[in-house]
Swiss-Prot record:
Domain of life: Viruses
Gene: A
Residue numbers annotated as active site: 384, 388
GO MF entry, a single one: endonuclease activity
Pfam families per UniProt: Phage_GPA
Name of the protein in question: A protein
ZnF region ranges: unnamed: 287-309
Keyword DNA-binding: yes
């Protein structure tokens, strides 16, 4: 779209940033405003131009203004589906009713006597005309945005727009674009114009790749949970484990409110803010964090949720449930018991060695036999919740026909009936992502941190993402043109795997891929990397867990 002078790129400069760009990855770098808008805008234009070409191939307008369509074209199927969806008359002009647009949908053979072109009805033509105009209008809006982008400006620049832009639109370019992308995602464009994305072929390679991706996400989620527990403990925060159930008479209300869980956690955050004497309109991210995983009971088929609340300050009215009791068996926190409006909740104080409750003077609880609960590590609660993460991941894979676990078809059907927005893990923004600052580290060390293995630190994926984020900040003042020039050639992993299968066979594929993705061990890394991991408190030696934690108690 933009022309750049051939002398613009400085090869030494491009060569210097190539390894940084490759390590950070375009998915991270495109979080920068200017680069993000540039990439998204070009992607949207490409899609809309494809759709426009689709709508203009296989149709002809004659000198009288009548529209004629080739019934064998791909466009014929699109127009037929649109007419059926909108309830338009499916008949063609000047052609017997023995063949209509509905017949194209059902795949009925076109009569041999049919002409090469069939005349569309006025109703269908009007819908077609308005559709094409709509595509052109969407394209023009994208061209307007693209015309305001400066490829030679830095990737972190937020484009505002010139005087011409201000005459056309009310908001600055970047705000206008963010709103457009949010209100009009690409999937909606495809759906509205009946231009479905081609479905990929499901074979052994695609299954291996999808299963590997899901397992990787599961592992990353568990790492975030465990790191959040570590951080909360180091800051002296309170940890509360909660189970949220759904009452029969509240099921409809829960499913009718897509923000039920979001509102619940927001209310808890506001309770913490109030306890700290702050406005409920403040952000609670610095004093409250949460993690929530759904569970679908395989025995009774009931959806419920397990949540971990991390609080700097307990809500007002939070009292030791065992104060003044002869037998200290209670662990539920009274101030949180009536906050879940869709059923029953059981907020339990998580007790472990050197917890915040002990420092606040809460009595140590006992079990049903009157014996003091065994003191465990703060990380043990993370392991306990992690099993629910693993269980949900197993269900997700089973629904997709992946994994080794056997699940009955009835369960798969029931899971598919639950809205995806409900049956997903949710957590606070940047939950468990905080690590020691990397601003002082060399670029070489940052690149090394993206490759360390689990034996260096069990938080290696979090380490990787933080290092990439730091690299992004160091590339922030590079131009869009520089970054695009420095980006590596991308490889279609699925295509690569399929080609590889022909050489080594499907049975050896997983082991071969594993050998290609080896991580750096403690003997491979530099002293600066070792020192950072140790200083951050995330070395393997710092995080040994010997005992297990259970969520029992009342």
């Amino acid at each position: 779209m933009f022309k750049v002078h051939s002398d613009y790129f400085s090869k030494p400069n491009i060569d210097a940033i190539k390894p940084l760009v490759e390590t950070a990855g375009m998915s991270v770098l495109t979080q920068s405003p200017n680069l993000r808008i540039w990439k998204q805008c070009n992607t949207r234009i490409k899609l809309l131009e494809e759709i426009l070409a689709h709508y203009t191939n296989g149709i002809r307008r004659d000198d009288n203004g009548d529209f004629w369509m080739n019934p064998n074209s791909q466009l014929a199927t699109t127009i037929a589906y649109r007419a059926h969806h909108k309830g338009h008359n499916p008949k063609f002009k000047q052609y017997p009713e023995t063949f209509t647009l509905d017949d194209i949908i059902t795949g009925k053979p076109i009569p041999q006597t049919a002409p090469d072109e069939l005349q569309l009805s006025d109703e269908i033509v009007e819908d077609y005309r308005l559709t094409v105009l709509s595509i052109i209008e969407e394209l023009q809006e994208c061209y307007d945005v693209l015309g305001q982008l400066d490829i030679n400006n830095t990737i972190d620049h937020k484009p505002l727009g010139n005087d011409h832009w201000n005459l056309l639109y009310e908001k600055p370019v970047y705000k206008h674009w963010y709103q457009l992308v949010s209100n009009r995602p690409l999937k909606d464009i495809r759906a509205d114009y009946n231009y479905a994305k081609a479905k990929g072929v499901k074979d052994e390679c695609s299954k291996i790749l999808e299963e590997s991706t899901m397992k990787s996400r599961r592992g990353f989620t568990v790492q975030r949970l465990m790191n959040a527990m570590r951080t909360a403990h180091s800051k002296g925060w309170y940890v509360v484990f909660d189970t949220l159930t759904l009452a029969d008479d509240r099921l409809k209300d829960f499913y009718d409110n897509p923000n039920a869980l979001r509102d619940y956690f927001r209310d808890i955050g506001r309770m913490v803010l109030t306890a700290e004497g702050r406005s409920v309109h403040d952000s609670s991210s610095d004093c409250y964090q949460y993690f929530c995983v759904p569970e679908y009971g395989t025995q009774h088929g009931r959806l419920h949720f397990h949540a971990v609340h991390l609080m700097r300050t307990l809500p007002l009215g939070s009292l030791d449930p065992n104060f003044g009791k002869l037998v200290r068996i209670n662990r539920q926190i009274n101030s949180l018991q009536n906050t879940w409006p869709y059923g029953y909740s059981m907020p339990i104080a998580v007790r472990y060695s050197q917890d915040a409750f002990s420092r606040a003077g809460w009595l140590w609880p006992v079990d049903s036999k009157g014996e003091p609960l065994k003191a465990t590590s703060y990380m043990a609660v993370g392991f306990y919740v992690a099993k629910y993460v693993n269980k949900k991941s197993d269900i997700d894979m089973a629904v997709k026909g992946l994994g080794n676990k056997e699940w009955n078809n009835s369960l798969k059907t029931k899971i598919n009936l639950i809205p995806k927005k409900v049956f997903r893990i949710r957590m606070s923004r940047n939950f468990g992502m905080k690590l020691l600052s990397m601003a002082h580290l060399s670029a070489e060390t940052l690149m090394e941190l993206t490759q360390v293995g689990y034996d260096v630190t069990p938080f290696n994926n979090i380490l990787k993402q933080n290092a990439k984020k730091e690299l992004k900040s160091r590339l922030a003042k590079k131009s869009v043109a520089d970054v695009l020039e420095a980006q590596p050639v991308t490889t279609n992993l699925l295509k690569f795997m399929r080609n590889l299968t022909r050489t080594i066979g499907a049975s050896n594929l997983q082991s071969f891929i594993a050998s290609m993705t080896t991580k750096l061990t403690s003997t491979d890394i530099s002293d600066e990397t070792k020192n950072y991991v140790a200083s951050a408190g995330i070395a393997v030696a710092n995080l040994r867990i010997k005992s297990k934690w259970t969520a029992g108690g009342k």
